[in-house]
Structures are given as C-alpha cells and as structure tokens.
Regions:
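Short histidine-centered beta-strand/loop micro-motifs
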Residues: 54-59, 76-82, 88-89, 134-136
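Short, hydrophobic/aromatic-rich beta-strand segments within well-structured domains
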Residues: 68, 88-89, 144-145
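Double-stranded beta-helix
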Residues: 101-118, 130-175
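Glycine- and acidic-residue-biased ligand/ion/polar-headgroup-sensing regions
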Residues: 72, 82-103
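Conserved short histidine dyad/triad with adjacent acidic residue
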Residues: 64-86, 125-127
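A short, N-terminal "cap"/entry segment at the start of jelly-roll beta-barrel domains
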Residues: 1-62, 114-115, 175
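Short, compositionally biased strand/turn segments
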Residues: 42-48, 52, 93-110
Length: 175
C-alpha cells in the first residue's frame, strides 16, 4: 500500500469513528439486513448513504458511500468496477474480500474490530480489479464501501461467457 493510499484510508477510517456516524450506519445496516432477509434468493443487499452524514472532510475523489450486507456463508462470485476505485471497511462480522482473478485469488480477511490494524479492517480495490467476497458461515457481513463515482453511476461487471464481451454490466441503483 502506498503512503498516499494509506493516508486516504486513514481519513475514511477517521470519518467513520464518530458515534453519530456509526449510529447512522447501524440504522442503514438494520434496513439493508431486513431487505436481505426478505429476499431469500439474494446473496447481498445494499443501500447508498449521503456523504454529508460524515462530519469530516473526505478525500476529494470519494463520490459515494454504501452499506452492503452479505449473506452468511455466501461466495457472491467475481465482480469488478470498471468506473470506480473502491475502498471497503468491515463494519460488522468478518469475511474474506479476495482480489485478483479467477484461479489466482489473493485472500484479504477483514475483521470489524476497531482496534485492529488498518490493513485488517480495510481493503483498497483499484478500478477494474476483480474481487469476490467470501463470507463466514456464522453471520452476515456488513461492510461500508466508498467509491469514486456517484451512487447512480456505479457499475458492477461480472463474468458472463454467454456474451461476446465475456462480461455483463449493471448499475447498482438500476437493479
């Protein structure tokens, strides 16, 4: 991790440490977890939240913030964001946010302990880097993600052998 990227993650980490911010995020986690519980076939559910909830200055490239809840025991499969650099923090529970590409995954086990080192709680995923969350079977995993595009522009791309391009794309808010 470069010193510049560490500085960005530290700024985001600081923004998430206040009690009022954590309470707001917990309320979003509750809603998103309820959505996931209603959708028995879904592996994850999500909701963006306004950046102005964070009472501190964010790195200027941050354009959206999200809460994702990933189902216990799930492997959501490979995905990447062709238009955004993602920075993600484990908020509740734990999981392995693997990066790389199919057949050559690199493990990044993340925990939600606020006293754990930054590298054990955060991962930085550059634009177009394949990643896949693998969630522990004992509990759902709630994460906070920051992206470099506005919420309505965030694209998820997944492998799809049935398409000429070999992938399919969708916007998270278009689902």
């Amino acid at each position: 991790m470069t010193p510049e990227e560490r500085s960005r993650l530290e700024a985001l980490d600081t923004a998430l440490r206040s009690n009022s911010v954590r309470e707001h995020i917990r309320s979003v986690v509750v809603r998103v977890r309820e959505q996931l519980a209603r959708r028995k076939d879904a592996l994850m559910s999500w909701e963006p939240f306004p950046l102005d909830v964070l009472a501190t200055t964010l790195p200027p490239e941050i354009r959206s913030a999200w809460v994702f809840v990933l189902r216990a025991g799930a492997d959501t499969g490979a995905e990447r964001h062709p238009n955004s650099h993602q920075r993600m923090m484990s908020f509740e529970g734990s999981g392995d946010l693997q990066t790389g590409e199919p057949g050559r995954w690199q493990s990044n086990v993340l925990v939600s302990d606020p006293d754990a080192p930054l590298e054990r709680r955060w991962v930085s995923i550059r634009t177009n880097v394949w990643h896949r969350p693998v969630i522990d079977a004992s509990a759902d995993w709630a994460v906070v993600s920051f992206h470099t595009v506005p919420a309505e522009e965030l694209i998820e791309e997944r492998p799809d052998d049935s398409r000429e391009a070999g992938t399919r794309q969708m916007k998270y808010l278009g689902k």
